[in-house]
Amino acid sequence: MSTEAQAGHWQDSWRDGWLLRARAVASPNFGPRPAGGGIDLIVLHSISLPPGQYGGPEIEQLFCNRLDWDAHPYFQGIRGLAVSSHFLIRRDGELVQFVSCDQRAWHAGRSSWRGRDNCNDDSIGIELE
């Protein structure tokens, strides 16, 4: 496939910042990106909820503000946390998208990279289960 064909193929895979190949689960935890900025950073995280447990619904519940804080003792330490990520790649390979790439997900917290603060402003957050 030519480079032009590959580029066209990927352009057809997106709509309003959503990757059509991903399962969309809209998170309320996002905001606008600063005007005039662009995306030039990818932040990779690893996550399991509760820690060391995989494949359950808790990550999606956390990112959508639906986690039962009383379901596991660990959750008391993160009670009230409002976070999200653009993408989650599950251990079985499933790709889930929570926030449009045109928007600012809340994954990096207070952050700095190479002298720039607020990494959420110009990054894509990807969680690896």
What residues fall within each predicted segment?
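Active-site-adjacent loop/helix surface patches within enzyme catalytic domains
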Residues: 2-33, 41, 48-129
